[in-house]
Amino acid sequence: MTKPAKKNMKSPGKAIKFLRFDWDKYYRIGRQERWRKPRGIDNAIRLELKGYQPKVKIGYRTDKQIRGLHPSGLRPILVKSVKDLEAFAKGKQDVIIIISSTIGLRKRIELIKKAEELGLKIANR
């Protein structure tokens, strides 16, 4: 199993939200949260001019070692039942539990009690 991320490891910092060109001018474009590559001949973002929003590049990607980890440095696991909890009880040092949003209150309380018994950490109590 992998070890939790070390404290001296480079943290991802604040993620840049890459917005589409002219997203603030048109409601139709502003609603779309998806990046599209600018293709215009004089487009300032495509030309990477100073003062304009950054263009998507591979250099913004997080390190492989910490990609997908919880901010605590633990690997998040989605849990929907007590059976799932027991499956991850063995490698509990490097795992943090996330209870599924579709779980009701009664089952959620049951999962929290079981996780505390097994000594597992829960991200969304």
Curated annotation (Swiss-Prot):
GO terms for biological process: translation. GO terms for molecular function: structural constituent of ribosome. SUPFAM superfamilies: Ribosomal protein L32e. It comes from the Archaea. Keywords: Ribonucleoprotein, Ribosomal protein. Belongs to the eukaryotic ribosomal protein eL32 family. This is Large ribosomal subunit protein eL32. It comes from Sulfolobus acidocaldarius (strain ATCC 33909 / DSM 639 / JCM 8929 / NBRC 15157 / NCIMB 11770). The gene is rpl32e.
